[in-house]
């Protein structure tokens, strides 16, 4: 079998432990752009959302939004898993590791925000719990779980 060409981003190097000197300015620039876009869930004002949720949306619109939020709340967990277990362990370039580390933080904030929105809008505990566990309880999201499980099995074969 022919050998695979070396990928600099995957090649271990002692340089990966120190950020400077920057060796990949384009990757560093992407990290800095991501850093500049930082926000927190607490910065989002939800004070008017309940009124709008109850009075401005139809039942169909609420149903759609609930399921979109449930899908994203569940899917972000899969994204986080891949970033933290795959990308952070495979990638060796410090600029890329900084970017992925920051992306993990952003994904955590997104996950918190989707969950906070569900927690804010859905008053019924049983329905809210069902939506929080969408990856197990909603057929569309079950496909995400099955894809994740297949990915985990493939990873073990490497």
Swiss-Prot record:
Similarity comment: family membership: Belongs to the ribonucleoside diphosphate reductase small chain family.
InterPro entries reported in the protein's UniProt record: Ferritin-like_SF, RNR-like, RNR_small, RNR_small_AS, RNR_small_fam
Record-level Gene Ontology MF annotations: oxidoreductase activity
One BP annotation, GO: deoxyribonucleotide biosynthetic process
Signal peptide residues on this chain, from the entry's feature table: none
Domain of life where this protein originates: Eukaryota
Organism lineage string: Eukaryota, Viridiplantae, Streptophyta, Embryophyta, Tracheophyta
Protein known as: Putative ribonucleoside-diphosphate reductase small chain B
Family matches, as PROSITE patterns: RIBORED_SMALL
CDD domains: RNRR2
Gene: RNR2B
């Amino acid at each position: 079998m022919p050998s695979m060409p070396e990928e600099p981003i995957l090649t271990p190097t002692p340089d990966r432990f120190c950020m400077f000197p920057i060796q990949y300015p384009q990757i560093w620039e992407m990290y800095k752009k991501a850093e500049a876009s930082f926000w927190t869930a607490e910065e989002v004002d939800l004070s008017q959302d309940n009124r709008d949720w109850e009075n401005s949306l139809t039942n169909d619109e609420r149903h759609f939004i609930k399921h979109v939020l449930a899908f994203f709340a569940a899917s972000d967990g899969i994204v986080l898993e891949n970033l933290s277990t795959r990308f952070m362990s495979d990638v060796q370039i410090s600029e890329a590791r900084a970017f992925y580390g920051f992306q993990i933080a952003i994904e955590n904030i997104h996950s918190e925000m989707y969950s906070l929105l569900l927690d804010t809008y859905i008053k019924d505990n049983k329905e809210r719990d069902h939506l929080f566990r969408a990856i197990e309880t909603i057929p569309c999201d079950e496909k995400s779980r099955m894809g994740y499980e297949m990915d985990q099995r493939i990873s073990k074969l490497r």
